[in-house]
Amino acid sequence: SVALVACATAFVVTLAGCGSDSKTSSASSSSTTTSSVAQPLASSTTETAPAEPASACPMTPPANGGAPEWTLRGTTGSVAVTGSTATAAPVVTVTAPFSVTETQVHTLQPGDGPVVASTATVTVCYMGVNGRDGSVFDSSYERGEPVDFPLNGVVPGFQKAIAGQKVGSTVAVAMASADGYPDGEPRAGIAPGDSLVFAIKSLGAA
C-alpha cells in the first residue's frame, strides 16, 4: 500500500526515522559483504510514492554482480559501488567495518537534466547500507518504486549527495556519522558513529 511504501522513506527524510524492530542483513563472506536490497521500514504516513512505473527502480541486481564504478578505502575498511541501470539494481560491497570521517560523494553516471537545487523536492531510487556490518537498512529498489521528498528535510549527507547533481544522475555517497545519524538510529540498526553508504538514482526534481 501507499502507506507502507511511504514509511520506508521516513527514515531518510527525517532525523528521527521510522524504523522497525527488524532489519535485513545481506549475505556475508569473511569481512566482506555485498548488499543489494532490503525490506522496507515500518509504516508512516508522512510521505507518498510518486506515480512512476515500478521499472524506474529495478529490483534485481546484475547477474554477475556488476563491475564496480567507485571504490573507496575508508578510515577503516573499504566499499565498492556499482550503480543501478535501467534493468538492474545497485550493488554495494562493503569490507567491514567501513568508516569515513568526511562525507564523500561520487557521480557514477552523470545525468542530462536540470541541476538539482538544495531546496528541491526530488524523486529518487536509493539503497542505504551500514558501513559497520554491510547490512542494508532501507531500499526503494526492494519495493520497485521511486519515492519523493524535500531535500531540506533529509539528513545532511543525503542532501550533499543529490544537491548540485543533474537530474538523471546515478550517485554514491559515503556518509560520515556527523552527516547521518551521529546519535544512532536503533530501530534501523544504526549505532552512534556508524558511517553509511547510499547508492542513489535521481529521477526528477521540482
Walk through the language-model features, giving the residues of each.
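Cross-family detector of peptidyl-prolyl cis-trans isomerase
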Residues: 1-206
